Amino acid sequence: MAPRILVVDDSAVVRMALSQILGRAGLEVETAIDPLVAMDKMRRARPDAIVLDIEMPRMDGLTFLDRVMAQDPVPVVVCSGLAGPGSEVALHALEHGAVDVIEKPRLGVKGFLEDSARRIVEVVRAATQARLRARVRALRPLPRPPAGAQPRPAPRLAPRAGRAELVVVGASTGGTEALRVLLEAMPADAPAIAVVQHMPEVFTAQFAKRLDKLCRIEVKEAADGDRLLPGRALVAPGNRHLSVKRAGGLVAVVSDGPPVSLHRPSVNVLFHSAARVAGPGTLGILLTGMGDDGADGLLELRRAGAHTVAQDESTSVVFGMPKEAIARGAAVEVLPLPRVASAVLAWAR
């Protein structure tokens, strides 16, 4: 049976365009002109995913999102003109349960949607597979062991030649919250960190600024030539590749170039460069996300002597990228999200 998608948007043009795009991909599409109509339709038949605008009459999209997540969580993809450059609204949507964001221009919407059809279908299909309970488990602290219990021994890590120099992290769907959990747990003197998170162009700058306010380490959008230093995390800019080179230390390289593994930025680009440049001094981490970007790169890191970690299925919103890495034999450890940070700290000791 085809997944059921509910498109909630007050624009008839957008509803028609999205219905055609998703319908051609074999998805069953229902539409609603605003959230109140959507709630009535959801009472009759629960959708597998919702594509949601933000600015609508009678009830705005964020209020509707909060209600959906509180009452009967359904995977939501935000597709809105407000989800553009520097948008606090898009960050709010992701923090309150949306699994992904598609930015929509205010002019030429129909043409943009048609040009972006492949990404829209990919994101919405991934949303239908998202496990929102996994997101809750990932954000919940691990239970404390009972009094008197023997502490669990730290995992035995592969021998490392040289010092702990660089942590590289890749994520896609569900990754914004996973990255927050990971980076908030890092101490001020954590090893240098480079991050690729699949998200729209320019949106990454605001995402990095938000993380910087929450974390003890510095978090910023990477610029070409930035130094990768202890206590700093660099986030790949949207629509640009991030790699690393050695020039009197580790340096970020931000570049154009064709998509790799269907993505720009690509996790594979970052991981392959880290394997070449830092090898055994690297820890590679592949978090929740759709597709297989990063799986080959994580395997190359492991072959180069790096320690490698994949997020487990129980805490992944979409168990795509980590699953592919595990299938390739790329992961030394498979861990729930709350234990990934402790693995970083154990490795860095």
UniProtKB/Swiss-Prot annotation:
Gene3D superfamilies xrefs: 3.40.50.2300, Methylesterase CheB, C-terminal domain (3.40.50.180)
Active-site residues per Swiss-Prot or TrEMBL entry: S172, H198, D293
PTM remark: Phosphorylated by CheA. Phosphorylation of the N-terminal regulatory domain activates the methylesterase activity.
Domain Response regulatory positions: 4-119
Compartment(s) where it occurs, according to its Swiss-Prot or TrEMBL record: Cytoplasm
UniProt keyword Chaperone, yes or no: no
GO cellular component terms, A-Z: cytoplasm
Keyword Protease in record: no
UniProt modified residues of type 4-aspartylphosphate: D53
Functional summary from the UniProt entry: Involved in chemotaxis. Part of a chemotaxis signal transduction system that modulates chemotaxis in response to various stimuli. Catalyzes the demethylation of specific methylglutamate residues introduced into the chemoreceptors (methyl-accepting chemotaxis proteins or MCP) by CheR. Also mediates the irreversible deamidation of specific glutamine residues to glutamic acid.
PANTHER family in alphabetical order: PROTEIN-GLUTAMATE METHYLESTERASE/PROTEIN-GLUTAMINE GLUTAMINASE, PROTEIN-GLUTAMATE METHYLESTERASE_PROTEIN-GLUTAMINE GLUTAMINASE
Family membership: Belongs to the CheB family.
Protein name according to UniProt: Protein-glutamate methylesterase/protein-glutamine glutaminase 1
Species of origin: Anaeromyxobacter dehalogenans (strain 2CP-C)
Lineage: Bacteria, Pseudomonadati, Myxococcota, Myxococcia, Myxococcales
